[in-house]
């Protein structure tokens, strides 16, 4: 099993990266938050989990052991595959996932594309007692997302496409991107696709937390 990677970062995309290890370029999928810690041409390291199927070997990378641990517990739930588990961690911090399961917070889980009320309840029941909160502060926990739309620009399509790859419909993704840009116009001015993707996913998660508490 490949438990971790450490080497020179060769490439970073919106949903994957390549790290050179011993003369080989190893590609892995990861959340935008994890990818934001990697920079091309510089040393980088990730914790990993290898998914073996009959027709493919897929490697997933994580910023730390905690993120990987939550991923590995999530994929043991019936109906939660690696792609959905990665989508959950793209929207929510690992500690938020732990709290949602422990506190039976279905609304937080349903902010993730592909998870409806029934699936959220199923995840909570199956993982009960296996994802205890650590008490770690959740970055950006006090932020709130705006629902006001903004004007679409061509470069937003890259963000929409990346979110579609995580399971959102294009309509849902575009609405989320517009709301984030409306709340923080400076993201639109910077035209940093990765930064906008991370902010949008964070806002999607926080919107669920805010509404769930009402």
From Swiss-Prot:
Question: Protein name, please?
Answer: Holliday junction branch migration complex subunit RuvA
Localization (cell): Cytoplasm
Domain remark text: Has three domains with a flexible linker between the domains II and III and assumes an 'L' shape. Domain III is highly mobile and contacts RuvB.
Q: Which GO terms describe its cellular component?
A: cytoplasm; Holliday junction helicase complex; Holliday junction resolvase complex
Primary role: The RuvA-RuvB-RuvC complex processes Holliday junction (HJ) DNA during genetic recombination and DNA repair, while the RuvA-RuvB complex plays an important role in the rescue of blocked DNA replication forks via replication fork reversal (RFR). RuvA specifically binds to HJ cruciform DNA, conferring on it an open structure. The RuvB hexamer acts as an ATP-dependent pump, pulling dsDNA into and through the RuvAB complex. HJ branch migration allows RuvC to scan DNA until it finds its consensus sequence, where it cleaves and resolves the cruciform DNA.
Keywords for the protein's UniProt record, in alphabetical order? Cytoplasm, DNA damage, DNA recombination, DNA repair, DNA-binding
Q: Name one Pfam family in it.
A: RuvA_C
Region called Domain III, residue ranges: 151-214
